[in-house]
């Protein structure tokens, strides 16, 4: 997978994060929004009506949210099905669920790709094992979106956690690398 596939491209996305995710009123979000409910600022053309003013409106969390490229991948997948925007709500629940799974896959890919830069395959079995897990996650990300519902993320999270700790050990300490580990 290319690094650019793991970077959000909001212009190529149907604002799936503005529907699929939930948030609670806090310093990052001015109001509560349950998962599966369209954000009150989402327009019919899948754009944020207040994007240029998020911080002032009490929504800095929206500005820093990172889907790791999962949003545009899901948008492409559903566009192929003939559902090109959020206006077609027939498959909202499955699209939202698939997006949330794919986002975790993309985040794990990003973490392991970054770790691989620190510990390349030439540094023994850590690099080779990283490459194998990256390939496994890449295959999940590239599979048809409906296959995501059959993915057990637990073993992949565990593998990522172990690999990131091993990279930390190989680099002389775990502290910096542990901050990358997905614990959920």
Walk through the language-model features, giving the residues of each.
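Ferredoxin-like iron-sulfur electron-transfer modules
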Residues: 1-10, 30-38, 180-184
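Surface-exposed helical/coil interface segments that assemble multiprotein signaling complexes
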Residues: 55-88
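Charged, amphipathic alpha-helical linkers/stalks
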Residues: 75-135
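Extended, small-residue-rich solenoid/repeat segments and analogous flexible loops
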Residues: 136-184
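Short, solvent-exposed segments of well-ordered alpha helices
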Residues: 1-4, 33, 89-99, 124, ...
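Local cysteine-cluster metal-coordination motifs and their immediate loop/turn environment
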Residues: 7-24, 37-68, 96-106, 110-113
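Ferredoxin-type iron-sulfur electron-transfer modules and their immediate structural context
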Residues: 2-17, 159-167
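Short, flexible helix-adjacent loops and helix caps
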Residues: 22, 26, 117, 142-145, ...
